[in-house]
């Protein structure tokens, strides 16, 4: 890790009442004196003139000094709070660079905080997630992760894995003892509880990812069932051409909307049917690719005819992991009322895109799937967190299979537990390659 002095503007670009420059390094008292002709008192805001090399005043503002290790980065930290004009901020930053600091790389302050043990990797990522939060729910979830709630949950799982590994090591180290350590400690029951806890955290993390990045929703179904009309209704604009001619939509149309601040990335696809039209065939192939990448599929059917055999074939082909909502459209042409109910294949909603009936029911169902109503329980998570949790689940399941075997192979059991622990360690940064750290922190703001 580089240990030189770094500096960056920590406030957003543009004009503002206050601008902040953050500086981090070792032994910054001489730096502060050269800049202000004052020796700052730790953790006090001091009024100071920020001096240029010729002794003239660049700006007057507040100087704050946080000595190591009680600072954000774990190093000495200075914060210069001046007037928020872009010119004066650049002049003040240039003076800091003249005094020996270099311009911080994106995320370098947070990276130093991580490497100095001030926060783990999940907490460091939560800093960026809090900055990027598009909704109050996402912001609150990011704060919980920043305060260590997600990390503590991972830590509890890690502790249980360590305890189980200790039992295995005891059995391997004392083979002459007539004691079945795994049976005596109820290893099977503990693995079962560990699996349940892993599944719970995976679900909460998955909901948090949706809360932050939004749902990818695909409108699917046979031609001329109202997919484009529903897209236009949800988007509040005429994005798609709507005609009574089947097969009007040949390629995917995309729109991003927000419901209660939750991003919804909606894709209207070509009607799914057998066709000899080569252009339409390409559109249908792309439709299935969009479905495979989505979080939710809205299968639209004509409320007048109900679910057809072709619709059942579409349902059967949908990936099991997908949330699915069967949408009975065109209820304005029937005696059916707008409603939500459960079916064997998932949730069903009766509505009319054309007459704007039942649209709010669909919006609320999408919010439910996105975790909006359970926002206080979710963790803001990233795709890499979900991959690591999934890998840990696989290794714990493999360990359980070993225990259930007629002749348990203790070495294999221990190895699966070790791999599960390593997967969890990737979340908090205990087992993380340097190149991955570079990718993660490069996506941060310069001043973070």
Swiss-Prot record:
Primary location class: cytoplasm
Top-level taxon of the source organism: Bacteria
Record: residues binding K(+): 224, 243, 245, 248
Gene3D superfamilies linked: P-loop containing nucleotide triphosphate hydrolases, Probable tRNA modification gtpase trme, domain 1, tRNA modification GTPase MnmE domain 2
Cofactor: binding details: Binds 1 potassium ion per subunit.
EC number: 3.6.-.-
Cofactor: K(+)
Keyword tRNA processing in annotation: yes
Role summary: Exhibits a very high intrinsic GTPase hydrolysis rate. Involved in the addition of a carboxymethylaminomethyl (cmnm) group at the wobble position (U34) of certain tRNAs, forming tRNA-cmnm(5)s(2)U34.
Gene Ontology MF annotations: GTP binding; GTPase activity; metal ion binding
Family classification: Belongs to the TRAFAC class TrmE-Era-EngA-EngB-Septin-like GTPase superfamily. TrmE GTPase family.
Any one biological process term the GO annotation gives: tRNA methylation
Subcellular locations according to the entry: Cytoplasm
UniProt: Mg(2+) binding residues: 228, 249
Biological source species: Dechloromonas aromatica (strain RCB)
Alphabetic keyword roster: Cytoplasm, GTP-binding, Hydrolase, Magnesium, Metal-binding, Nucleotide-binding, Potassium, tRNA processing
Residue numbers binding (6S)-5-formyl-5,6,7,8-tetrahydrofolate: 22, 79, 118, 448
One GO term describing the cellular component: cytosol
Subunit structure: Homodimer. Heterotetramer of two MnmE and two MnmG subunits.
Descriptive protein name: tRNA modification GTPase MnmE
Residues of the TrmE-type G domain: 214-371
Binding-site residues, GTP: 224-229, 243-249, 268-271
